[in-house]
Structure formats: C-alpha cells, structure tokens
Design a protein with these regions (language model features):
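Short alpha-helical elements
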Residues: 1-251
Length: 251
C-alpha cells in the first residue's frame, strides 16, 4: 500500500472503485409500469419489480412530461377529432392527503370547497366523446374560467354543447365570432330569449361518459400527486388510452 497519507489517512482508502454499468431498462417496460400506476392508483414504491426500478419509472414519467412527450401525443391524436360538435364540461376530483402536503396549494391547482381539498378537470370532447382539450384548476373555480382558452379554436359551423353553468353572453359571443353556435340551455333567470334545441342537447351525455371512463383509472379518480403538472399528465395518459382504443376499433 502507498505510504503517502492524506489528512493522516492512507491514500489507498480513496482509490476509485470499479463502476458496474447496468443495462438501460426498456422503454416499453417502463411505459407499462406507468400505465399500471395510472390504472391501479398505487404509490410508485408499490410498483412490481418486473416493470423495472420504481425510481426509473417515475423519473422517466417526469422527464417525458417535462419534455412535452405526453402533450405532443395528445395533440397529435386530438388533431383527428370530429369538429362538427364539441362539448365542454368539468369534473371535480378529491385530493388525497398525500397530494396536499405542500406549503402553497394555490400554485398546484388545489382548492378548498365544500367537500374539502379538490381539483377540477376541464375538458372539451368531440362528437364521439373523444377528448380534444384538457386543463386543470382549483376545485372552487367556476366552470367557465378557462372557456376563453379551451374554446379559442372552434371551427365554423361547429355546435357547442354545454350545461347551464356556461350560459353567459360572452361565451355565446365567443362561439359566434368563430362561426360556431352555442346550444346551451338558458338559466332560469335569463330574460332575453335565446335559440336552444333540447333534442340536440341530448348528445351532451358523451362528455359525462368521458369523465366516467378516465375515472376508471384510480390515479385520476383521486388526486395523489402533489404537482399539478404530474396529475394533469396522468389525465392526459388516460385520455390517450381512450383515443388509442377508439382508433383500434376503427376499420
């Protein structure tokens, strides 16, 4: 052993050890692990070992989200939506205590409403109930807060379906300026008459069924994620699965 010392210790104590290079975990295994967490709602630490190390799955989920991978996939699929009819609505999700352990919940789209800590999913779907736009706000936010953003790309001749919570003159004007027609039931206190078709309005159940489908994924039905960006990424992953299943069934 070398007799030279460093701070009174033999220099041999500081020799570099050999590094073992582990093979990269296959992306398909990692993606299956991410979908397993999405469907089961389990913590990352409970991820089965055959999906790879849990830290690897979580890190790639976050890195792909930060790189915009989930957004690009969602946008590419939504580009083929049926623009004849679009429906907008929201759904409230309870926030688990594991997702509410940060100092400032307001910056993570967590609000306090009658049911406790909640977040609200805003969605726009097409004539087939397939998602087009998705967003997230605190649970106490009004349903029409994001209308100016979610409805900014309506095509001419599009029929917009929404419930009474969206009966506002500025929303109808927003649709009219884009050449679309807002078929929204009037509020009971509305004085000026409007054009509304109850028969066409019956198709609005498709967006309710969309929320039912994504909430079959337990990671969406209850928010366990502290970061709003991570939770919205899970919502988009559930929506991507709906799009893929719809495309598989199309001849």
């Amino acid at each position: 052993m070398n007799s030279r010392t460093l701070n009174g210790l033999p220099s041999g104590r500081f020799c570099r050890t050999s590094h073992v290079a582990f093979p990269r975990v296959d992306d398909r295994r990692v993606l299956n692990g991410i979908f397993w967490v999405l469907r089961s709602g389990a913590p990352w630490r409970d991820l089965p070992v055959y999906y790879g190390p849990r830290t690897t799955c979580y890190n790639r989920f976050v890195r792909w989200r930060q790189a915009g991978v989930w957004d690009r996939i969602m946008d590419a699929l939504a580009a083929g939506h049926d623009a004849a009819v679009q429906m907008i609505d929201t759904s409230v999700v309870r926030v688990h205590q594991h997702g509410a352990c940060i100092a400032d919940n307001n910056h993570q789209d967590i609000g306090r409403s009658r049911g406790g800590l909640t977040s609200k999913i805003h969605a726009v779907v097409d004539n087939n109930g397939l998602p087009v736009h998705l967003a997230l706000t605190p649970g106490e936010a009004h349903d029409n807060r994001l209308c100016s953003v979610l409805l900014s790309a309506l095509l001419p001749q599009t029929m917009l379906l929404a419930d009474r919570g969206y009966d506002a003159n500025w929303i109808r004007e927003l649709a009219r300026q884009q050449g679309a027609w807002a078929n929204i039931p009037p509020k009971r206190n509305r004085k000026d008459p409007i054009c509304f078709s109850p028969y066409l309005y019956r198709a609005r159940n498709l967006i309710e069924r969309f929320f039912n489908k994504i909430k079959q994924c337990r990671r969406v039905a209850t928010r366990y994620d502290k970061l709003a960006a991570n939770y919205l990424a899970f919502v988009k992953l559930a929506s991507i699965r709906i799009w893929l299943r719809a495309n598989e069934s199309t001849p």
